[in-house]
A protein has these predicted regions:
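ABC-family P-loop ATPase nucleotide-binding domains
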Residues: 52-55, 110-171, 177-179, 185-191, ...
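Conserved N-terminal flank of the Walker A/P-loop in ABC nucleotide-binding domains
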Residues: 55, 62, 70-71
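Conserved catalytic/dimer-interface elements of ABC ATPase nucleotide-binding domains
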Residues: 93, 190, 233
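H-loop (His-switch) and adjacent beta-strand-loop-beta switch element
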Residues: 228-245, 253
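Helical segment within the ABC ATPase nucleotide-binding domain
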Residues: 198-211
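H-loop/switch region of ABC-family ATPase nucleotide-binding domains
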Residues: 219-220
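ABC ATPase nucleotide-binding domain signature region
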Residues: 21, 27-30, 68-73, 77-131
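Pre-NBD coupling/linker segments of ABC/ABC-like ATPases
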Residues: 1-57, 247-266
């Protein structure tokens, strides 16, 4: 990690109002332009040639604060830097510059992340609990609670490889929402759920926030933003375009999207 970059995790403190502080954050990721090929990789390795890789800027001078006990929704078009932001926040991706201060234990919820296809849904619940350091006596009781919340019925004892995308999402949301993370990062995990289950999850998120937990939610569902979020962050081309009241930020984003659509239609004529 460079001298200009720091990722700091501090113990939760009742006296601090911010769960996450992000200051002038910049990050990039690498994209390989040629198709992966063993012979090409070996030849490049032996000749000390580099693979054809492009560095793509993802975040540029991003600054914001996430209040403790809030639900902050991150919106924007594909490629705006939303998922990259979550990866930086939880420490998966090291930023090039800037500073992140996280006060509390984080859990990243992304469909399929940390799950084992060979295990049943119930076994994956236990695996997640053990990974979070949960005691065995608590885990046994909580497993049944999580299984009931996921609403998978008998499929909870089926191998994960038999699950649909929506079923995986239900299980992942149920596990993450019940392992008592102080900060929960959700990456598009609610996009595939039905209306009833989304309402079910919204109630749980409200309950977590009432306990002082903090949620950062990446989503394309603008209706979810308006109903669930207390703050909204609009990312555009890796920069903060707007931050504040969800209704206001969503309205500005929709106005911009409509103008872009009109410009595109005009250019096509």
């Amino acid at each position: 990690m460079s001298a200009s970059t720091s990722l700091v995790q501090e113990a939760a403190s009742v006296g601090r109002s911010a769960a996450i502080e992000v200051d002038n954050l910049s990050a990039s990721y690498r994209v390989r332009l040629d198709a992966p090929d063993f012979r090409t990789d070996l030849r490049n390795l032996l000749s000390r040639r580099r693979n054809n890789v492009r560095i793509v800027p993802a975040l540029r001078d991003v600054s914001f604060t996430v209040p403790r006990g809030s639900v902050t929704a991150v919106i924007g078009r594909n490629g705006a830097g939303k998922s990259t932001l979550l990866r930086v926040l939880c420490g998966i991706l090291v930023p090039e510059a800037g500073r992140v201060v996280a006060r509390g234990r984080m859990t990243l919820l992304k469909p399929g992340l940390g799950m084992n296809d060979a295990l049943t849904g119930r076994e994956n619940i236990r695996l997640g609990g053990l990974a979070m350091g949960m005691p065995e006596n608590q885990l046994a009781e909580l497993t049944d609670v999580i299984a009931q919340f996921a609403q998978l019925d008998e499929y909870i004892d089926f191998p994960l490889r038999t699950y649909s995308t929506g079923m995986r999402m239900r299980l992942g949301v149920a596990v993450a929402a019940h392992l008592n993370p102080e900060i929960l990062l959700i990456d598009e995990a609610l996009s595939g759920g039905d209306t009833a289950f989304k309402a079910h999850v919204a109630d749980r998120i409200a309950e977590l926030c009432g306990q002082g937990r903090t949620i950062v939610l990446v989503t394309h569902g603008l209706s979810s933003v308006k109903h669930m979020a207390t703050e909204a962050l609009w990312l555009h081309q890796g920069r903060v375009a707007a931050l504040g009241d969800p209704d206001d930020v969503v309205a500005r984003y929709m106005r911009y999207s409509r103008l872009e659509s009109l410009d595109s239609e005009f250019d096509d004529q």
